[in-house]
């Protein structure tokens, strides 16, 4: 009996637990042993398919800045075009759907001279956005005045009368004040609530020499400077050379406006130095909180755990995903280059190999 026990427990005849001799199609890569065949795996990755964008579950998702402002671009809303005034809903996530915002349908704007195309995207990055109820400057009595506030048939208001952007006042000198003037400076106070950023829109108008003399009493190029939050910007107006142009069915115009904005932090005053043709700030944007921004097309359909720039709305069925790597927000799977698997079975070895290692008595015992 003693001899038999020694044979059964010898190295040549050991019984290996946790190893099966059944066929296995599963291979996993390990850190220490490389590729290993196992009897079972749990897939940890998925490869998404492209779908519509969706609202992010558990939070509000903002598509257009003003969903109820029909036939308006986001730039129309950001500048306060008369027929594009409305509430911008709060949102924790926003869709950048106008990669290069289109022209505002009002007075012709020289978009490429400033960063004004970025204004809708700047606003989109805030959770809460509202337009002030009061004007930040009294345009009629501003330095260099008295002024009348100009309007244009190219910018009709809700009653189809002449209008202009709500964020700016076109300061046209009164008849007895149409003369050239040296640069003057006006302070732009902070009128938003503490903790908000104030986005102040301003600009200037220029035209051909004849119109410049008629409107302002000076046909020379005019100088303009804005300064806020440590950022100073300089401009010189261009006189003439503009083909007549209409925006969104408006009246053809020989003049152009240049529009810019400045960001004023809580309690900080800004300044604008100007000559003739100034578009003085009026209503300002008050914004707070952060909204995560992702680039994609509209509309938003349904809800999803995750918003992905390439795949749209995703529901998280696995912790990881393969495919195209792009920006994503929400409860999203983690991108990996290759599929990941978690072994939930035992290590596989062919039956012939097990018989050789165990020997005759071990094979019977196994």
Curated annotation (Swiss-Prot):
Keyword Magnesium: no
One GO term (biological process): fusion of virus membrane with host plasma membrane
Cellular compartment(s): Virion membrane; Host apical cell membrane
Signal peptide: 1-12
InterPro entries: Capsid_hemagglutn, Hemagglutn_HA1_a/b_dom_sf, Hemagglutn_influenz_A/B
Glycosylation sites: 37, 71, 157, 177, 315, 344
UniProt keyword terms in alphabetical order: Disulfide bond, Fusion of virus membrane with host endosomal membrane, Fusion of virus membrane with host membrane, Glycoprotein, Hemagglutinin, Host cell membrane, Host membrane, Host-virus interaction, Lipoprotein, Membrane, Palmitate, Signal, Transmembrane, Viral attachment to host cell, Viral envelope protein, Viral penetration into host cytoplasm, Virion, Virus entry into host cell
Membrane topology, record value: Single-pass type I membrane protein
UniProt keyword annotation of rRNA processing present: no
Post-translational modification comment from the UniProt entry: In natural infection, inactive HA is matured into HA1 and HA2 outside the cell by one or more trypsin-like, arginine-specific endoprotease secreted by the bronchial epithelial cells. One identified protease that may be involved in this process is secreted in lungs by club cells. Palmitoylated.
Main location: virion
GO molecular function: host cell surface receptor binding
Pfam families, alphabetized: Hemagglutinin (PF00509)
GO CC annotation: host cell plasma membrane; membrane; viral envelope; virion membrane
Subunit structure as annotated in this protein's UniProt entry: Homotrimer of disulfide-linked HA1-HA2.
Family as reported in the entry's similarity comment: Belongs to the influenza viruses hemagglutinin family.
The protein's role, per its UniProt record: Binds to sialic acid-containing receptors on the cell surface, bringing about the attachment of the virus particle to the cell. Plays a major role in the determination of host range restriction and virulence. Class I viral fusion protein. Responsible for penetration of the virus into the cell cytoplasm by mediating the fusion of the membrane of the endocytosed virus particle with the endosomal membrane. Low pH in endosomes induce an irreversible conformational change in HA2, releasing the fusion hydrophobic peptide. Several trimers are required to form a competent fusion pore.
Note: Major glycoprotein, comprises over 80% of the envelope proteins present in virus particle. The extent of infection into host organism is determined by HA. Influenza viruses bud from the apical surface of polarized epithelial cells (e.g. bronchial epithelial cells) into lumen of lungs and are therefore usually pneumotropic. The reason is that HA is cleaved by tryptase clara which is restricted to lungs. However, HAs of H5 and H7 pantropic avian viruses subtypes can be cleaved by furin and subtilisin-type enzymes, allowing the virus to grow in other organs than lungs.
Protein name per the record: Hemagglutinin
Gene name of this polypeptide: HA
């Amino acid at each position: 009996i003693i001899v038999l026990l020694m044979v059964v427990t010898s190295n040549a005849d050991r019984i290996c637990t946790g190893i099966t001799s059944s066929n296995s199609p599963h291979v996993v890569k390990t850190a220490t042993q490389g590729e290993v065949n196992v009897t079972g795996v749990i897939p940890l990755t998925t490869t998404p398919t492209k779908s519509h964008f969706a609202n992010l579950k558990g939070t509000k998702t903002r598509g257009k800045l003003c969903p109820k402002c029909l036939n308006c671009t986001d730039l129309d809303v950001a500048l306060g075009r008369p027929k594009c005034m409305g509430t911008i809903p709060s949102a924790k996530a926003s869709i950048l759907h106008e990669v290069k915002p289109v022209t505002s349908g009002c007075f012709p704007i020289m978009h490429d001279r400033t960063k004004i195309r970025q204004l809708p995207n700047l606003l989109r990055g805030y959770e809460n956005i509202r337009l002030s109820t009061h004007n930040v400057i009294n345009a009629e009595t501003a330095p260099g005045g008295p002024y009348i506030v100009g309007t244009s048939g190219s910018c009709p208001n809700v009653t189809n009368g002449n209008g202009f952007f709500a964020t700016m006042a076109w300061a046209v000198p009164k008849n007895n004040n149409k003369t050239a003037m040296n640069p003057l400076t006006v302070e732009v106070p902070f009128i938003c609530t503490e903790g908000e950023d104030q986005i102040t829109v301003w600009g200037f108008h220029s035209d051909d020499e004849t119109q410049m003399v008629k409107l302002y009493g000076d046909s020379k190029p005019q100088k303009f400077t804005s300064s806020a939050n440590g950022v100073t910007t300089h401009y010189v107006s261009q006189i003439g050379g503009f083909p007549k142009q209409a925006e969104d069915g408006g009246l053809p115009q020989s003049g152009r406006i240049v529009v810019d904005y400045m960001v004023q932090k809580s309690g900080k005053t800004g300044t604008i130095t100007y000559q003739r043709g100034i578009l003085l700030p009026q209503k300002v944007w008050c914004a707070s909180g952060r909204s995560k921004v992702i680039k994609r097309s509209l509309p938003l359909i349904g809800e999803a755990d995750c918003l992905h720039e390439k795949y749209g709305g995703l529901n998280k069925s696995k912790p990881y995903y393969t495919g195209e790597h792009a920006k994503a927000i929400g409860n999203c799977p983690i991108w990996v280059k290759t599929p990941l698997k978690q072994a939930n079975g035992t290590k596989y070895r062919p039956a012939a190999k097990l018989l050789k290692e165990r020997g005759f008595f071990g094979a019977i015992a196994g």
